[in-house]
């Protein structure tokens, strides 16, 4: 498993993943409408890590940000939240960032759970596309 340096936070890992993803997609940062950050190891209690990432990524101050503190189900939960936000028609592009530096809190002496965890950050891009009526089917 991977262990981040003690000076590295979850936002550092997600920042690197997000910058690469935005570059690969050739997205303008101003076009990103929401950023949701999922972690059990946020950088701070306050301010929200999503707001820190919004600033570090250079996103618009109009970009909606939200932290979600969940473990295994966090990514799926955040996907549901972004999907709901986008289906309202007010948001087109979003970033789902998930990261943890959990090994700072884990003991390598705990042989039952320590091997299950690692430090990582991920970035997922989502873009809303309306379906034409002719492409929709009812069941």
What feature does the model see in each segment?
Residues 89-120:
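Flexible, glycine-rich active-site loops centered on histidine and acidic residues
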